[in-house]
Amino acid sequence: MTQESSSSNHYVDESSFDNNNNNNNNGGEGSSNEILIRIPFLHDSVPALYAMFALASLFVLLATILSAHLIYKHLKYYTQPDHQRYIVRIVFMIPIYAIYSLLSLLLHNYQVYFALLRDCYEAYVLYMFFALCVSYGGGDKNLVTHFTSHPVMRLPMPLFFKFKPNEAFLQVCRMGMLQYVLVRPAVTLASAIFEIFGLYDEGSYAINRFYFYNAFIINVSVTVALYIVVLFYQAAAEELAPYKPLLKFTSIKIVVFFCFWQSIAISGMTNFGWIPTLDGWNSGEVSTGLQNFLICFEMFGVAILHQYAFPYELYRVRAFSAAPLIHRVEMGTVFKSVINSVSQKDMVKETVKSFKGTKITDGKTGLYSGLKDEVFNEFDIEEIEMGDFTSANDNNNFDDFDFSENNINSNNKDNNSSIYNDGASKKNHIGSAILAGGGGGGKKDNDLITDDDFFSLMNNDYANIDFSNFDQDALEEMNFDDDDDDMAFTARR
């Protein structure tokens, strides 16, 4: 780089670093203390900010294409709505975050208003991620049961004292996540209002500017939310393990937590005078533009990460493994899937649970009430006692199977006579067909062998078996020296 006149597009004025604080106050207007960066492959007359916008647009386009493809695949193979509705909402965060950051880079004077919409969806997605983890864990009552039986654990740093989860643990986690959902949009809305009256001042930590309070409040809120996420993951690790949650947690942390602390770090650099002016922008505007540019680039990386963190192939396998589902998934449920994923009924239920909580013990007695299975009317079956079976001819007549010889002979003879129905079965497979005492037409009666003989067959102990009950012709074909395992296996069957 070379130092030139103020009309040149690429120069460095060394005094810009010494007088940077003054530039913050006068907005950089009419000042020669500017730094322009030479961008490779671009003509010298192209301003650096235009080059940043061009590069950011490329990353945003790629990130949007990747995310749109993943969302479409999940909607096409929408076989598990309890999971995929949350996945679709989480993945949709990438285009929203990237596009709003790109618009903030282009229209930097209105970036605080774009940030309002972006931050609202960011808080919403964090809550959806928590709801997805609850769904992965089998629902509220399953997780509460798991937490109450969980051994004593140590809290994550910086708190290391021991902690025993109880029934209220899931509700505490929900409230910890919900506070961020409420605080982040509220503070961003307040920032937009203060910006209208000129009292926001992006990047300034003066106590008479709202940016200082904005950064402090959101920092506390996001730290609590992050701590709750880590604590929940630590307590529910066993339940979440089959879903490989590490990549999912990483993608959420990058978007929600890393991006926020990155903005705080850049603002701190501005406050210390480490961010110069650029193309007529003061250092505060440059820091905001740099943050938006980095987000555009980072969203492309997160979009790639989402391909592995939230793959659609698992649900595609589920679709093709069930014949009645193939036609429905392939032939036109994408629109219905969109409606289901957009509906916010589950969000309302989650919010109600945050205040109501989930109990698995009786509030009056304190006794365990157990998990209640969902009841589906189409599967209503009349309960019968163990050992009672309904007669095929009379629905109101119940026979005691254990003492009904007719039931034994009529219901068991087919199964007992052909344990192996293929012609290649070995001759020493013992079935009821070799029991002695034949009936008419060479058919064998189905008298049961004694318990002692049965367990002797299972243990390959032939010395204690009374072979007088077996058909002698069939026994001559048996080989008791070879293939003992097959005989024991047949006895077990």
Curated annotation (Swiss-Prot):
- Biased-composition ranges, Polar residues, are 1-10
- Identify this protein by name: Transmembrane protein 184 homolog DDB_G0284525
Please describe what this protein does: Probable transporter.
Query: What InterPro entries does UniProt report for this protein, alphabetically?
Result: Ostalpha/TMEM184C (IPR005178)
GO MF term set: transmembrane transporter activity
Write out the transmembrane intervals: 46-66, 87-107, 119-139, 180-200, 212-232, 254-274, 293-313
The cellular location(s) given in this protein's UniProt record come to: Cell membrane
Looking at the Swiss-Prot or TrEMBL record, what is one Pfam family this protein matches? Solute_trans_a
Q: Which residues are glycosylated?
A: N415, N416
Q: Does the keyword Manganese apply?
A: no
Q: What membrane topology is given?
A: Multi-pass membrane protein
Outline the segment boundaries, as ranges, of region: Disordered.
1-25
